[in-house]
Regions:
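Acidic/histidine-rich alpha-helical segments that form the ligand environment
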Residues: 10-17, 21-28, 78-137
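Inter-helical turn/loop segments and adjacent helix faces that build the functional surface
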Residues: 30-39, 108-124, 149-158
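Extreme N-terminal tail/first-helix region
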Residues: 1-9
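Conserved alpha-helical segments that form or flank metal/cofactor-binding pockets of metalloenzymes
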Residues: 38-73, 143-150
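N-terminal leader/targeting helix
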Residues: 9-55
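Short, contiguous alpha-helical
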Residues: 58, 125-159
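A short small-residue
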Residues: 1, 30-35, 77-81
Length: 159
């Protein structure tokens, strides 16, 4: 029974990890509909789409296992971003995603331990966490490339 509860904890943390992220806030508040760099906006849309996919998949497992879906809320501090250019936020988004990647690695360790106790039923959870880590690594690469491109554009267009 404890391993089943541990699986619920891992899945709930995974959902909150993505759902309460600054990237998800940007998506849900439509901040990226404002004027700004289109390539950066498209990259952010792709990243958030992947994150939403992980949330959906984790929630599907939670429902199938008859677990409660976690509640999540955005920090009030995020509302201060409404008048800020996305390029200005990019370093903050990268730093936040790096922290979330470390949290995912801890979740992976917990999920692996559950698989040992519970078997294949928890294997889906462990695999989902592994996929999320791999995706986040790719997302960080994409965001760092965008950051580098934007810095190069500033230096080449400066007088």
């Amino acid at each position: 029974m404890a391993s089943k509860q541990n699986e619920e904890v891992v899945l709930s943390r995974l959902v909150r990890l993505f759902r309460q992220s600054p990237l998800m806030y940007l998506s849900e508040s439509n901040i990226w509909t404002y004027r700004g760099d289109e390539s950066l906006k498209l990259t952010l849309v792709d990243v958030v789409s992947d994150h939403q996919n992980f949330v959906d998949r984790a929630e599907t497992i939670l429902v199938a296992e008859q677990f409660e879906l976690p509640q999540s809320f955005f920090p009030l501090a995020f509302t201060g971003w409404h008048d800020v250019d996305l390029a200005f936020l990019l370093p903050t988004l990268i730093a936040d995603l790096e922290k979330r990647e470390k949290s995912l690695q801890i979740l992976r360790d917990h999920a692996d331990g559950i698989v040992g106790q519970r078997g294949s039923a928890a294997g889906k959870t462990a695999e989902l966490v592994r996929e999320a880590i791999s995706a986040v690594e790719g997302h960080l690469d994409m965001l760092r490339q965008q950051e580098k491109r934007l810095k190069n554009n500033v230096t080449t267009t400066a007088p």
